[in-house]
């Protein structure tokens, strides 16, 4: 069991015991975070970033860690999230293996990793932990709360469970509930991990490690993170050089197969499998319809419960952005977020971007996502 904590990571101790939404408690838990910029005297210029499943808190280079971060093009002086103006905080999700307490962390009661004894994790737990970091930094209200992918879910839960915590919100490629397609994909990913004999009921180590299962899970994920349009444009039906092609007729032959294999191998040893299972399942369970005043399903309009849940959020301004080619969190989900927030009284806008990169577009298509984020923050 390994945690992967970047240099310069800071830690916030959560209240102990910490009750979890689905039952169970954590003791001596912590959240990893990093910061950029300077907090104003009135603490009114804070921006919080909550992340997708796999990122750490190192969104960009800073004084504590000059290495480029996972959102380097978006966070920094003069960048769309301008640290000359904003005090930016990025938190690593509770349940992760990148510094926050998760299944790979040591259980203080046993002195051994939690593994599957870690309590069931919900997006709401992730949100509550992030809110505690905000309060600990002396921030009464964020100027803006930004969430991307799973972080879009976390942000909505945070806004709903902690009213008044932010003046504005940017939801990037997020959703207010998990769709059946997304649940199905994540189910296959978890099954691939759990069927690997080296997973061993969660009791693996660095030698006996479920590498094949993690590799398959990552390949499935990468396929859904991009779009058919991008696959066609990047790879077409181009084959590998003959000297790189295995004798096996079912081995790697096309460039796209080689890309998936290389991408998966780079990932598998840098994310804990049990943490992957917990965070993945937390997204399946997330559904803002639970917070609708009337939880009875409307057969004629099943989305009404989600919209009613979103309408419970009180925020002044919001922007929901997505890529039109996203198949994992389809752009209709971001449109739904804007609609629901408007019903709650927000000045909420929706922006669907014609990016070919699918769900991962916010991580690579800065030419489209950067100006949208910059323009929104200019009015905050």
Curated annotation (Swiss-Prot):
Domain of life: Bacteria
Gene Ontology CC entries for this record: cytoplasm
One BP term from GO: cysteine biosynthetic process from serine
UniProt-annotated catalytic positions: 149, 326, 359
Keywords: Acyltransferase, Amino-acid biosynthesis, Cysteine biosynthesis, Cytoplasm, Transferase
Pfam families membership: Abhydrolase_1
Protein biosynthesis in keyword set: no
Record-level Gene Ontology MF annotations: homoserine O-acetyltransferase activity; homoserine O-succinyltransferase activity; L-serine O-succinyltransferase activity
PANTHER family for the chain: HOMOSERINE O-ACETYLTRANSFERASE (PTHR32268:SF11)
Protein name: Serine O-succinyltransferase
Organism: Xanthomonas campestris pv. campestris (strain ATCC 33913 / DSM 3586 / NCPPB 528 / LMG 568 / P 25)
């Amino acid at each position: 069991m390994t945690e992967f904590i970047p240099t310069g990571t800071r830690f916030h101790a959560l209240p102990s015991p910490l009750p979890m939404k689905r039952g169970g408690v954590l003791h001596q838990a912590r959240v990893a975070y990093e910061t950029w910029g300077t907090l104003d005297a009135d603490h009114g210029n804070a921006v919080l970033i909550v992340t997708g499943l796999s990122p750490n808190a190192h969104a960009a280079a800073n004084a504590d860690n000059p290495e480029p971060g996972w959102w380097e093009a978006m966070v920094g002086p003069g960048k769309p999230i301008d640290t000359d103006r904003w005090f930016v905080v990025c938190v690593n999700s509770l349940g992760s293996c990148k510094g926050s307490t998760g299944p790979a962390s040591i259980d203080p009661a046993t002195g051994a990793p939690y593994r599957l004894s870690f309590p069931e994790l919900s997006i709401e737990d992730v949100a509550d932990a992030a809110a505690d970091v905000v309060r600990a930094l002396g921030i009464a209200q964020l100027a803006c709360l930004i969430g991307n992918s799973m972080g879009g879910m976390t942000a909505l839960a945070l806004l709903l469970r902690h009213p008044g915590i932010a003046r504005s919100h940017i939801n990037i490629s997020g959703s207010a509930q998990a769709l059946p397609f997304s649940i199905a994909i994540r189910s296959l990913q978890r099954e691939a991990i759990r069927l690997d004999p080296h997973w061993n009921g969660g009791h693996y180590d660095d030698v006996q490690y479920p590498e094949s299962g993690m590799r398959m899970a990552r390949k499935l994920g990468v396929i859904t993170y991009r779009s058919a349009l991008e696959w066609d444009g990047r790879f077409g039906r181009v084959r590998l050089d003959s000297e790189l092609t295995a004798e096996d007729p079912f081995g790697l032959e096309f460039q796209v197969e080689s890309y998936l294999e290389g991408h998966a191998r780079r990932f598998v040893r840098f994310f804990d499998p049990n943490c992957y299972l917990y965070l993945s399942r937390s997204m399946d369970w997330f559904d803002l319809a639970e917070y609708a005043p009337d939880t009875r399903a409307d057969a004629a309009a099943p989305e009404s419960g989600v919209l009613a849940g979103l309408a419970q959020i009180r925020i002044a301004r919001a922007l929901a952005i997505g890529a039109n080619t996203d198949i994992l969190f389809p752009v209709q989900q971001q449109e739904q977020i804007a609609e629901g927030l408007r019903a709650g009284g927000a000045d909420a806008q929706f922006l669907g971007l014609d990016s070919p990169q699918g769900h991962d577009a916010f991580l690579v298509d800065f030419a489209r996502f950067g100006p949208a984020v910059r323009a929104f923050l200019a009015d905050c």
